[in-house]
């Protein structure tokens, strides 16, 4: 007898920021229960699929009871009797038939909510792996038609600024990538050691308070100069003895400080802001180029506003060979926006966030499209996370080559890194760590 879905239930749980989010349980006819929870971002791109929130005064408007109800009343009953291994069929059914809402960038999930659809999509994927009797990462690889499993290079967000932190720093994330490690296990060692050295460097320079951690486990010292963040990383990497082996990545999240006057305000968090730090896209572009010359930077994410295609393309053509230019708010994991960016040569790497697009199938499509264009792919958490580890398996199964899921601190971040350690151990001699090939770990599939 074929194993089928017998029930789908959702509930409201809490993310790592104490805000409500959606968790779904998919129960199968053999008694197996697959469970998945969705994350939520702080700096969200305006083109992301619609996340349904209740509004009103409960939970300060952030409740998800409507999304939960949509799973329990609309999606759940409609999936009973379906084959959990048919990921594409189930995702398309939810997105195109049960929801059916469309905007200029495709299926926008406005009726049921991307958070409702995704929770079920992730749980169905876990259920499908169970039915096939294979680990989740292998099931994901099979769904994508990928033959090569690869452990990603972790990009640890160790200094927080932007919308993630209460300091004056405009740029949102300063990351370390252990590209010189020979395994994921060694990469974790390097990352953790640099993190602890960074903590003592910051404590010595700015005092104990500066070592409090932000939403993603990174430190948020009260510095204003973005260059100072890079300097701290360089020092910590050297103190740990990993110069040349651990390199730097940045997530600028520039949409957060882009004004209607088309300037970028590096002073946007200052209360008495007199506009003295407002700069043009060209000046900002040259600032990045100076950073790249002075520091071992291999990756810059969201360097410009999500609609500033012109400066994205300029930066990519000028430094794209040496540095990956990652589209997050620009692309929002949306296949149509990825297509546009490929055509306009706007960037050369995709940030993969399943909750930006709202289904496993569409996420896989965005990744395949990116890889065929010769781009890099970085799987990513959100700042409001849960203990769910789906993205760890997703990253290995799709051979993204890179993953960012916070600092080596805070359990909702370590949950993903620890899962990757388990996967590497399980693969044994077959385990491949992306290392220096993090931008193109496998041939396109």
Swiss-Prot record:
It catalyses: (2R)-2-phosphoglycerate = phosphoenolpyruvate + H2O. It is found in: Cytoplasm. Mg(2+) is required for catalysis and for stabilizing the dimer. Its cofactor is Mg(2+). The active site is at 216 (proton donor), 353 (proton acceptor). GO terms for molecular function: magnesium ion binding; phosphopyruvate hydratase activity. GO terms for cellular component: phosphopyruvate hydratase complex. It comes from the Eukaryota. SUPFAM superfamilies: Enolase C-terminal domain-like (SSF51604), Enolase N-terminal domain-like (SSF54826). Substrate binds at residues 164, 173, 301, 328, 380-383, 404. Pathway: Carbohydrate degradation; glycolysis; pyruvate from D-glyceraldehyde 3-phosphate: step 4/5. It is an enzyme of class 4 (lyase). Mg(2+) binds at residues 251, 301, 328. Homodimer. NCBIfam families: eno. Belongs to the enolase family. HAMAP family: Enolase (MF_00318). This is Enolase 2. It comes from Hevea brasiliensis (Para rubber tree). The lineage of its organism: Eukaryota, Viridiplantae, Streptophyta, Embryophyta, Tracheophyta. The gene is ENO2.
